[in-house]
A protein has these predicted regions:
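A conserved pocket-lining segment of Rossmann-fold NAD(P)-dependent short-chain dehydrogenase/reductase
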Residues: 151-154, 195, 201-222, 226
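Glycine/proline-rich active-site loop of Rossmann-fold NAD(P)-dependent oxidoreductases
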Residues: 175-178, 190-202, 234-244, 267-269
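Mid/C-terminal beta-alpha module of Rossmann-like enzyme folds, strongest
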Residues: 230-299, 316, 321
Length: 323
């Protein structure tokens, strides 16, 4: 299988290097001989840099990691920073179901525009782009969703942001003649993050018994280290074109996850019972009250309707075969 040349002396620019996926990409690249130039929003904030520096120390290659400061909403800084790198891995975004919706959408779209433009100006020909199965969708029920499928729901700012920004990336890649490879991970679990993402931040509530019954919402899962490896392999393998869904553990629901937690950790208070669909309106109401009390909201009425229109039957066959 033809691959890219030896990683020695190649430098990969990683945006959002401190994020859940980003920091694991940095570690994987360092472990595989690459130089890494990673961007964070505030380079003076140790919480955004210390774990990256530790990765380089663990691998014994501190000299191969360079950290720079950059906000993806700033259009003017990126081309100069990326110039001289061999590829761009664009992971930076706001992954949240609770922050300002328009900010989430604007950050995704503007970040994509700024970074793809910078890649063109810097002469980078191959870009690896982090999207999500949120851009693939969970409909129709009963059929395995593949890379040919696109999200049709507009049920949350995050779903809108990931779908519209990936479409924008493909449009720009065609216009700029950039070889774009897109990774579409499902819910990403596994350690190695500073702040929990929506994929994992409900686990403490599950383990501590704050969720007495779990909603039967569709769920597919992938480990963050597999996501990191997939990004690197998408860059290295010449034939690795297009989109790549990462959902090796699929056809699950949140109830299945809770039962697995209970089986692995019998002393936890994880629920084993699922909430009947007929009671989901009460879940939405309870979630709304939590929002009034300043707690995170997980399930609006619109989000719940979107969940139940589809399932988590999502195929990772292409990624398994190619990457």
């Amino acid at each position: 299988m033809p691959t890219k040349p030896d990683s020695k002396n190649q430098t990969i620019f990683v945006t959002g290097a401190n994020g859940h996926i980003g920091n694991q990409i940095v570690r994987d690249l360092l472990e595989n001989g690459y130089n890494v130039k990673g961007s964070v929003r505030d380079i003076k904030d140790d919480t955004k840099t210390s774990h990256l520096i530790q990765h380089a120390k663990d691998v014994g290659v501190e000299e191969r990691l360079e950290l720079v400061q950059g906000d993806i909403l700033d259009a003017d800084i990126w081309a100069e920073m990326i110039t001289g790198c061999d590829s761009l891995f664009h992971t930076a975004t706001i992954y949240s179901n609770t922050q300002d919706g328009q900010l989430i959408i604007d950050t995704a779209l503007l970040g994509t525009t700024h970074l793809l433009t910078a890649a063109r100006d810097a002469g980078i020909k191959r870009v690896v782009y982090t999207s999500s199965v949120a851009a693939v969708g969970n409909t129709p029920k009963g059929r395995a969703k593949t890379e040919d499928d696109w999200q049709t729901e507009r049920s949350s700012p995050y779903i809108i942001a990931k779908t519209d920004s990936e479409r924008k990336a493909w449009e720009m890649a065609t216009e700029f003649d950039i070889d774009l490879r897109v990774i579409n991970p499902s819910a990403v679990i596994g350690g190695g993050f500073v702040n929990p993402t929506p994929s994992v931040d409900f686990f403490p509530d599950i383990v501590n018994g704050n969720v007495p019954m779990a909603p039967k919402i569709p769920l597919s899962i992938v480990h963050v280290r597999d996501v990191a490896i997939a990004h690197r392999r998408a860059y290295e393998i010449d034939e690795a074109s297009g989109r790549f869904i990462l959902a090796p553990h699929n056809n699950l629901t949140l109830v299945d996850v809770c039962r697995t937690v209970k089986r692995l950790y019998p002393d936890s208070k994880a629920p084993k019972r699922g909430i009947p669909r007929s009671m989901m309106s009460l879940v939405v109401l309870f979630d709304w009250f939590n929002g009034l009390r300043g707690k995170k909201r997980y399930m609006t009425r619109k989000t719940v309707k979107g969940f139940f229109r589809g399932d988590s039957n999502i195929s990772s066959k292409k990624a398994t075969d190619v990457l």
